[in-house]
Amino acid sequence: MSSRIEGIGRPRVEPSFVPDVIDEMLQVPDAGSLAAIRLLRQRTGHWAGGSTGTNLYGAFRLIARMLEEGHAGSVVTLLCDGGERYANTYYNDEWLVEQNLDIEPYAAKFEHFLNSGKFSVPDD
């Protein structure tokens, strides 16, 4: 199945994509993206869409790796999309069950990351 995150997993590459500026790409599970936006909402009150969750997931992994390797620096990501229009999907527990998405393992990993700086990917 392709991604349930809008705009991710499309068969075409957007004209604005500039591969020369990409340092690294990683696969992010849909459940991880959705756990990230729910964490953002819980911590900040900000509604964000799934692609923002994908960015947060990647940023958390990068920060954890930097800490583990002793690297200092800044990590910047974008809050790409508002999430209000996803109230009946990404933010709806019944929808998650219908889609067979379990965000709890990711939510637990994010809490652990925020408390320790260590992030490990749950087994899928």
Protein language model regions, located:
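Short Gly/Pro-enriched loop/turn and capping motifs at secondary-structure junctions
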Residues: 31, 53, 82-84
